[in-house]
């Protein structure tokens, strides 16, 4: 979460202190004394895991609970714009690669492949933007090219494809091949 370069050493120290304070407050607010998250949603667990906000001693417990919440929904995500982009990352970064693939490959509603089965060539704003009978979810707020759910593409090229940016050099110095 922390930038790699700063203009001054003092600025770096300030940001490191701020980060430590944010993590501490997050943990005090969203974890109880037994290591359970106070918000029992998929998104809360995803955010805590993906952004490194989970106390290390409770990491496995948090991952286990996230998989339980996923199982409770028959392997479906019930997340929105905050949790969806990081769901498969949170799973795969914590040893649950199979669950991440299973989530990606679900074909029934709500899922990415549900949209594909409905004829989608882009990622929709709503999982059921177009229903099986051809009617629209709603004429309002029904984009058929939407970012949040489309963020699965990043997980696909980084994790499935193994393509990562080389942050150690400037872009014009990088070569593929």
Model-derived features: positions:
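Active-site core of glycosidic bond-cleaving carbohydrate-active enzymes
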Residues: 1-175
């Amino acid at each position: 979460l922390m930038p790699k370069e700063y203009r001054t050493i003092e600025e770096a120290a300030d940001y490191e202190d701020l980060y430590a304070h944010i993590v501490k407050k997050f943990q005090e607010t969203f974890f109880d004394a037994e290591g359970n998250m106070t918000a029992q949603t998929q998104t809360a667990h995803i955010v805590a895991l993906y952004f490194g906000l989970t106390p290390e001693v409770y990491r496995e417990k948090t991952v286990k609970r996230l998989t339980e919440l996923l199982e409770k929904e028959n392997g479906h995500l019930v997340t929105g714009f905050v949790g969806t982009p990081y769901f498969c990352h949170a799973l795969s970064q914590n040893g649950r690669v199979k669950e991440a693939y299973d989530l990606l490959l679900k074909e029934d509603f709500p899922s990415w492949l549900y949209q594909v089965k409905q004829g989608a060539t882009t990622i929709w704003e709503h999982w059921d933007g177009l229903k099986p009978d051809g009617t629209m979810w709603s004429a309002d707020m029904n984009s058929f090219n939407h970012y949040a759910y489309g963020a699965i593409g990043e997980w696909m090229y980084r994790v499935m494809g193994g393509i990562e940016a080389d942050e150690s050099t400037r872009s014009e110095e990088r070569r593929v091949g």
